[in-house]
Structures are given as structure tokens and as C-alpha cells.
């Protein structure tokens, strides 16, 4: 009897995770200038200027990376990618934003927990410092998950005094 139950569990509907999620064309500026591709590793946008070159390259080469990774699908969620946050073509008004202070921005870049304002809706929030996107947080209401890439986090606990120039041009 136990083996039959295991077999039934293993015969779950494999199409369950293949629900088609629409590609969010409003995430980038000038949407008519972008082509979108849904792959196993995520959803990518490539500017139409480079699309013919990519198509030609894929005929004879293994393309490792092309375009901007917009996000990845996890269950029914489309999780925005860090590269989207850093893309100069990001349409920032599409997402709720949280402007961070210098101290909060450093905490975010250390991948530490920060508190988001109660006025923000649940879901993915673009965090910015002086109007420049740093990345994403997922607002769960009572707390927020820091989605900054683990391998990019600041490991030093030292905060320079007197210089609050996190971003300089």
C-alpha cells in the first residue's frame, strides 16, 4: 500500500509549473524597441538593435548570455532580477519604490534586513538611493525579504565617516 501512495505522488501533473506567465513589457522603457525571450533560466529582454546579431550568432555559437535578465519564474511568481534593477532602461514607475537613507542603503547592500514604510504595497519593491536603483525587496507586510545577490553583498562592517557618497559619477 505504501509503494502505491509513493507512485501516485510521483505521477503528479508535470504541467503544473508550466503555467504561461506573460512577459512584462512595461518593465522597460520604449517597449517597442525590445524583443523578449522566455527561457528555462528566466525571461530576457534584448534591444531590437542587437536581435538580428543574436539570431545570427545562435546559429553557429553557444550564446552564454545576451540581453537583460528581467526575472525568473518561481511557482506562480515572476521574480524581478537584479540586472533589471540596474538596467538603465528600467521603467521605474512600474514598481513601488522605497527611497533609502545612506545607513539603510548600506544595510541593504550588506543583505541585512531593513524596514520598509507601511505605505508600500505587498510584493516586489524597487529600493533606491538618491533616486538610483539598488535592487529589490519582497514586501510581505510584517517584514521584507532582501533580494540583493548573496555573492555581491558588502562583507565589511566598517562605515566610512563623513562621506555619504554611496554612488558617485
Model-found features: residue ranges?
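Polybasic, low-complexity RNA-engagement segments
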Residues: 1-169
